[in-house]
């Protein structure tokens, strides 16, 4: 019997991580970057794993300028630790990903995971202002603001965001941060999709809006006292305890998928899910999450419907056999050839996360 041993590396500096990545790449060993491990089920089943390269010891706040509202951190810091630090200055990073707690900042950038607050603040890419990445050749490349060196010809922040560590390992990032709102109130109704439409058309837009398979709707309003109090009075929904969002962000089914579609078509797609399916959706964003309790055939069928509507169905977690049967990503995007050329340029031996990303 042959026993495969996976080496586990836990560097404490970016330079050390870059050296370890280069050492592995020079031996053509397959390297899997690991942050908090909260999204390890996302993507295809890795073809092989020789080295796990953990970032959790890269957990420092490098710089926080309260006046400039900018923070620079190492990639292994958890979102919770960063929020705790920012709260001392009445600031925050508007990230509330599912499968929390425990996400690292680097992991969130590599996966592109977001949460309900994306409705108001956008994705992390919208407030990411700088990034530093270790490449397989051992170099540390940077892009954006508060960095030392840019890689000519490439937008490093766009390249590495959501690329699942297939082009390099994120070691640090800088963000614009936001002041904590003066008022933060959540209200709820049983109004289903019509209730969600009502909340979206109020004079003050919600910062987050979620609808659930049982017809329940949550709307979160943030801002000045007068503006928030006026909109929740006019809406007339029941006030919900703010802890509901922490419980909501903890959702992490064993088998689940993210369905993204044009906002106008999201409701129709969700209504095509198998009867009795568990789901929740962000109608203002055009994203739904499906807790899968049906067979692979149902998932493949739903993906076809999503793609026909101009959307996607991406698996976020499933047992390996199920993932292989349905596929993680669906049909390749139109940019697949460009993505392959980039992969060949940054990682010519394909040592980073082989088999996991779409290329």
Language-model segments: residues:
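N-terminal glycine-rich flavin-associated loop
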Residues: 2-31, 55-101, 113-144, 182-189
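Conserved glycine-rich FAD pyrophosphate-binding loop
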Residues: 12, 43-48, 56, 99-100, ...
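A short linear hydrophobic-aromatic micro-motif
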Residues: 30, 94, 205-210, 276-280, ...
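Glycine-rich beta-strand-to-loop/alpha-helix junction loops that act as flexible
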Residues: 34-39
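Short, conserved charged micro-motifs
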Residues: 80-82, 192-196, 225-232, 265-273, ...
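FAD-binding subdomain of flavoenzyme oxidoreductases
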Residues: 95-96, 100-207, 217, 221
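Terminal amphipathic helices with adjacent charged low-complexity linkers/tails
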Residues: 220, 224-240
């Amino acid at each position: 019997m042959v026993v495969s041993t996976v080496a586990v590396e836990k560097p404490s500096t970016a330079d050390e991580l870059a050296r370890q990545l280069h050492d592995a790449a020079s031996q053509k060993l397959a390297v899997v970057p690991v942050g908090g491990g909260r999204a390890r089920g996302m993507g295809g089943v890795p073809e092989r794993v020789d080295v796990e390269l953990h970032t959790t010891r890269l957990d420092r706040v490098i710089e926080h300028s309260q006046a400039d509202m900018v923070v620079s951190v190492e990639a292994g810091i958890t979102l919770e630790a960063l929020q705790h630090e920012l709260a001392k200055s009445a600031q925050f990073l508007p990230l509330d990903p599912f499968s929390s707690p425990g996400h690292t900042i680097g992991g969130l950038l590599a996966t592109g995971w977001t949460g309900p607050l994306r409705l108001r603040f956008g994705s992390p890419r919208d407030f990411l202002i700088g990034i530093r990445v270790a490449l397989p050749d051992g170099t540390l490349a940077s892009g954006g603001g508060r960095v030392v060196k840019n890689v000519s010809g490439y937008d490093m922040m766009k390249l590495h965001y959501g690329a699942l560590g297939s082009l390099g390992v994120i070691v640090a990032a800088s963000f614009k941060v936001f002041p904590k709102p003066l008022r933060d109130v959540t209200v709820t109704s049983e109004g289903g999709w019509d209730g969600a439409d009502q909340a979206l058309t109020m004079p003050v837009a919600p910062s987050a809006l979620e609808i659930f398979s049982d017809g329940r709707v949550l709307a979160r309003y943030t801002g000045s006292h007068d503006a928030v109090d006026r909109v929740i009075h006019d809406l007339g929904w029941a006030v919900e305890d703010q802890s509901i969002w922490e419980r909501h962000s903890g959702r992490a089914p064993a088998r689940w998928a993210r369905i993204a579609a044009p906002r106008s078509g999201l409701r129709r797609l969700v209504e095509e899910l198998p009867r009795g399916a568990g789901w929740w959706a962000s109608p203002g964003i055009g994203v739904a999450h499906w807790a899968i309790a049906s067979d692979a055939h149902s998932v493949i069928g739903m993906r076809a419907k999503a793609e026909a509507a101009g959307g996607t169905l991406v698996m976020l977690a499933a047992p390996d056999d199920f993932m292989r049967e349905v596929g993680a990503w669906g049909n390749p995007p139109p940019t697949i050839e460009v993505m392959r050329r980039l992969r060949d340029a940054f990682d010519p031996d394909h040592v980073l996360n082989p088999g996991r990303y779409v290329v």
